[in-house]
Each structure stands twice: as C-alpha cells, then as structure tokens.
Amino acid sequence: MNAKVMLVCLLVTMLVMEPAEAGIWSWIKKTAKKVWNSDVAKKLKGKALNVAKDFVAEKIGATPAEAGQIPFDEFMNVLYS
C-alpha cells in the first residue's frame, strides 16, 4: 500500500471517528456537570469544606472562622512547620 492510499485511509478514519468521540465526550461532560451541581454533591462539598476548616483550625490553633480567613501560603507554611 503506498503512502497516498494510507493517507486517504487515515483521513477517512479521522472524519468518521471524530463525531463519535465528540458525542461521547460531550455526554461525559454533561453528566459530570449534572453530578457536580447535584444536591448530594453540594452537601458533600460543604461537609468537606467544614472538615478542612476544622483541620486547619486544629493544626494552627485558631477558631474555624479564623482558619477560613488565612491565606493559602500561610496555611501551607503552618502545615509543613
């Protein structure tokens, strides 16, 4: 098989596969967006945020409200000191 025929086969394959892959990726993106914005995910994100604030507060010896206000750099310095 010469190079020109191989190139044509490759281009036809790409033209056929690209719409199919685009459909799959758009479905995955749409589903992930629905899951991320669901009520269960929002509750879990809120719980994770509260646990993280409590962890930081315990680690630095501050109240959770103060721990939520510190900059990220200071938080990382406290964790590794």
From Swiss-Prot:
Keywords: Antibiotic, Antimicrobial, Cytolysis, Fungicide, Hemolysis, Ion transport, Membrane, Secreted, Signal, Target cell membrane, Target membrane, Transmembrane, Transport. Disulfide bonds: none annotated. Expressed by the venom gland. Belongs to the non-disulfide-bridged peptide (NDBP) superfamily. Long chain multifunctional peptide (group 2) family. GO terms for cellular component: extracellular region; membrane; other organism cell membrane. The keyword Ion transport applies. It is found in: Secreted; Target cell membrane. Its main location: secreted. This is Antimicrobial peptide Con22. Residues 66-81 form a propeptide. At high concentrations, acts as a pore former in cellular membranes and causes the leakage of the cells. At submicromolar concentrations, degranulates granulocytes and has a weak hemolytic activity against human erythrocytes. Also strongly inhibits the production of superoxide anions. Has a strong antibacterial activity against Gram-negative bacteria but is less active against Gram-positive bacteria. Also has antifungal activity. Residues 1-22 form the signal peptide. GO terms for biological process: defense response to bacterium; defense response to fungus; hemolysis in another organism; monoatomic ion transport.
